[in-house]
């Protein structure tokens, strides 16, 4: 259940990944509420995710979008794909992502696809193992994207040239 929208003010793409109805049981019955999980990105490497909780769906989505805008990270992309193959995890969710050639497209499951698309990744092969809980898959994908490093940054950290790193 991924819904997409482009925010005209900031040029951010917004995607709703999940809305979940939750219930609090009280003496008089149940009180229902909603949680929402959203991802936002500028399509150029900036991406964030957020969760919101409220009694009504629109309020939960709005809170989630605000949280996502506050929780953005910058990802160094290699053109339209990721820098290198990577594995990441969060809880029991494990994700594997690898760069793909031009024209491949985003081959990834629901929650991962939403994150990668708003980040601006257009060609990637990705797989989710273990738990497919959307919240944990999004967090695992973020962990992977955060850990990704360009050859230039690795070379600078090691004090070597880019050619030495790549060969």
Curated annotation (Swiss-Prot):
Cellular-component GO terms for this entry: small ribosomal subunit
Keyword hit for Ribonucleoprotein: yes
Keywords (A to Z) from UniProt: Ribonucleoprotein, Ribosomal protein, RNA-binding, rRNA-binding
Superkingdom, natural source: Bacteria
Known partners and oligomeric status: Part of the 30S ribosomal subunit. Contacts proteins S4 and S8.
Family: Belongs to the universal ribosomal protein uS5 family.
Protein name: Small ribosomal subunit protein uS5
Origin species: Alcanivorax borkumensis (strain ATCC 700651 / DSM 11573 / NCIMB 13689 / SK2)
Lineage, highest ranks first: Bacteria, Pseudomonadati, Pseudomonadota, Gammaproteobacteria, Oceanospirillales
């Amino acid at each position: 259940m991924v819904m997409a929208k482009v925010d005209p003010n900031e040029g951010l793409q917004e995607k709703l990944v999940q809305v979940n109805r939750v219930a609090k049981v009280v003496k008089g019955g149940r009180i229902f509420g909603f949680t929402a999980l959203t991802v936002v990105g500028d399509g150029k490497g900036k991406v964030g995710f957020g969760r919101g909780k409220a009694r009504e769906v629109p309020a939960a989505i709005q809170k989630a979008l605000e949280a996502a805008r506050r929780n953005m990270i910058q990802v160094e992309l290699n053109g339209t794909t990721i820098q290198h193959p990577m594995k990441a995890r969060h809880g029991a969710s494990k994700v594997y992502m690898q760069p793909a050639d031009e024209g491949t497209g985003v081959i990834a499951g629901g929650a991962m696809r939403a994150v990668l698309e708003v980040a601006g990744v257009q060609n990637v092969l990705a797989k989710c193992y273990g738990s497919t809980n959307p919240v944990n898959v999004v967090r695992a994908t973020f962990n992977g994207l955060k850990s990704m490093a360009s050859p230039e940054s690795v070379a600078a950290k090691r004090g070597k040239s880019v050619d030495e790193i790549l060969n």
